[in-house]
Amino acid sequence: MTTTTTFKGVDPNSRNSSRVLRPPGGGSNFSLGFDEPTEQPVRKNKMASNIFGTPEENPPSWAKSAGGREDSESPGTQRSNSSEASSGDFLDLKGESDVHENVDTDFQASLAQVEEKPVPAAPVPSPVAPAPAPSRRNPPGGKSSLVLG
């Protein structure tokens, strides 16, 4: 004879039932068709539940290290973009403005030379003709039902 395991319902003193009626949280999951005031449990570590909302008061530690870099700098320090650094400009921290102007004029002169050169037009690629479809195609299994005489 085969026995089946049965589970208790919501009330532990009620008769045995084959359904599990109690949710993992322990509360009831019965819906009677009207809104009941329910209390949502407060989650301490919300990961991406409000990505468009206001930032959290206590972000996780990984968010502090990734997003906090810009905030951690003091307002007195100056930053330069990588494009500024590669163009030959530099920040004038010691008051050497005449050297900075010389670099600036040299840079503008080199830009003028670059602008005077005509840019060759990109060659237009010829349209690629699609491969011709074969006149006979085999079915996926490879076996053809074609009867040859």
Swiss-Prot record:
GO terms for cellular component: cytoplasm; nucleus. Residues 91-103 have a biased composition (Basic and acidic residues). The modification N6-acetyllysine is found at K143. Residues 1-19, 74-86 have a biased composition (Polar residues). Keywords: Acetylation, Cytoplasm, Nucleus, Phosphoprotein. It is found in: Nucleus; Cytoplasm. The modification Phosphoserine is found at S28, S31, S82, S83, S87, S126. The modification Phosphothreonine is found at T54. Its main location: nucleus. Residues 1-149 are annotated as: Disordered. It holds the Pfam family JUPITER. The modification N-acetylmethionine is found at M1. Residues 120-133 have a biased composition (Pro residues). It comes from the Eukaryota. The modification N-acetylthreonine is found at T2. Interacts with the complex composed, at least, of APC, CTNNB1 and GSK3B; the interaction takes place with the inactive form of GSK3B (phosphorylated at 'Ser-9'). Belongs to the JUPITER family. Modulates negatively AKT-mediated GSK3B signaling. Induces CTNNB1 'Ser-33' phosphorylation and degradation through the suppression of the inhibitory 'Ser-9' phosphorylation of GSK3B, which represses the function of the APC:CTNNB1:GSK3B complex and the interaction with CDH1/E-cadherin in adherent junctions. Plays a role in the regulation of cell cycle and cell adhesion. Has an inhibitory role on AR-signaling pathway through the induction of receptor proteasomal degradation. This is Jupiter microtubule associated homolog 1. It comes from Rattus norvegicus (Rat). The gene is Jpt1.
